[in-house]
């Protein structure tokens, strides 16, 4: 039994594609699943950072700052930003001879 559903055969007019059993429910289901898989894969590659960040952290944006004085909020923001900033002093330059 062959897994191929399409066979190309030479004719006088050129190459034709004859689909065998294209009305088979299994072929239709496989085609729909294949198309959905392709669409989901494309969306995943386009929005993977947003999707996985949403799955990891949910809808919360971070710790609540309700009831915290403004000076402490600013200090917290600066700490978070300094943790993200890259320090060039940690890189080592290696020169090859």
Swiss-Prot record:
Pfam families: Flu_M2. GO terms for biological process: protein complex oligomerization; symbiont genome entry into host cell via pore formation in plasma membrane; symbiont-mediated suppression of host autophagy. A lipid is attached at residue 50 (S-palmitoyl cysteine). The chain crosses the membrane at residues 23-43. Keywords: Disulfide bond, Host cell membrane, Host membrane, Host-virus interaction, Hydrogen ion transport, Inhibition of host autophagy by virus, Ion channel, Ion transport, Lipoprotein, Membrane, Palmitate, Phosphoprotein, Signal-anchor, Transmembrane, Transmembrane helix, Transport, Viral ion channel, Virion. GO terms for molecular function: monoatomic ion channel activity; proton transmembrane transporter activity. The record marks 41 as: Seems to be involved in pH gating. The modification Phosphoserine is found at residues 64, 82. Homotetramer; composed of two disulfide-linked dimers held together by non-covalent interactions. May interact with matrix protein 1. Forms a proton-selective ion channel that is necessary for the efficient release of the viral genome during virus entry. After attaching to the cell surface, the virion enters the cell by endocytosis. Acidification of the endosome triggers M2 ion channel activity. Cytoplasmic tail plays an important role in virion assembly and morphogenesis. This is Matrix protein 2. The gene is M.
């Amino acid at each position: 039994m062959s897994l191929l559903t399409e066979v190309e055969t030479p004719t006088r007019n050129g190459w034709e594609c004859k689909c065998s059993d294209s009305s088979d429910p299994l072929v239709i289901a496989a085609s729909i699943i294949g198309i959905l898989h392709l669409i989901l894969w494309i969306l995943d590659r386009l929005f993977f950072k947003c999707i996985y960040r949403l799955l990891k952290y949910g809808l919360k944006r971070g710790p609540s700052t309700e009831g915290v004085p403004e000076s402490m909020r600013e200090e917290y923001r600066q700490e978070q930003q300094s943790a993200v900033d890259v320090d060039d002093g940690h890189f080592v330059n290696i020169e090859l001879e």
